[in-house]
Amino acid sequence: MIQTQSKLDVADNTGAKSVMCIKVLGGSKRRYASVGDVIKVSIKEAAPRGRVKKGEVYSAVVVRTAKGIRRGDGSLVKFDGNAAVLLNAKLEPIGTRIFGPVTRELRTEKFMKIVSLAPEVL
């Protein structure tokens, strides 16, 4: 459950280390984002020679949440922290590698590239 001002780790090789959610996309009154939702983020911490710089604003898709996501069979998939993957204007991943597991809920037409790059799909 990600809301405005939430800090997230970055699960790709763009050079960003941590980001902060500045907007949850999908409606003017929408407050929370879960796995698979697109948010606007500001880069808060970045590697010196990465693709992105501190202070830049990007779209990102949430790939892991500590709150977890409930499946149809009643199971709950939780993670130790919150993580996102940075996207460009066409909602394609900027990085070429994904670190850590992602959930099966990302397996939609929009985010198949992220699922194929991920080392593990839960």
Curated annotation (Swiss-Prot):
Q: What does this protein do?
A: Binds to 23S rRNA. Forms part of two intersubunit bridges in the 70S ribosome.
* SUBUNIT field: Part of the 50S ribosomal subunit. Forms a cluster with proteins L3 and L19. In the 70S ribosome, L14 and L19 interact and together make contacts with the 16S rRNA in bridges B5 and B8.
Domain of life from the UniProt record: Bacteria
Please name every pair of cysteines joined by a disulfide bond in this record.
none
Q: Which SUPFAM superfamilies match?
A: Ribosomal protein L14 (SSF50193)
The record's annotation in CDD domains points to: Ribosomal_uL14 (cd00337)
**GO CC terms of this entry:** cytosolic large ribosomal subunit
Identify this protein by name.
Answer: Large ribosomal subunit protein uL14
Cite the PROSITE patterns for this sequence.
RIBOSOMAL_L14
Species source reads Polaromonas naphthalenivorans (strain CJ2)
In its UniProt record, a GO molecular function of this protein is: structural constituent of ribosome
Q: Enumerate the PANTHER family for this protein.
A: 50S/60S RIBOSOMAL PROTEIN L14/L23 (PTHR11761), LARGE RIBOSOMAL SUBUNIT PROTEIN UL14M (PTHR11761:SF3)
Give the NCBIfam families listed for this entry.
Answer: rplN_bact (TIGR01067)
Which family is it part of? Answer: Belongs to the universal ribosomal protein uL14 family.
Q: Give the record's keywords alphabetically.
A: Ribonucleoprotein, Ribosomal protein, RNA-binding, rRNA-binding
Might you name a Gene Ontology BP term for this protein? translation
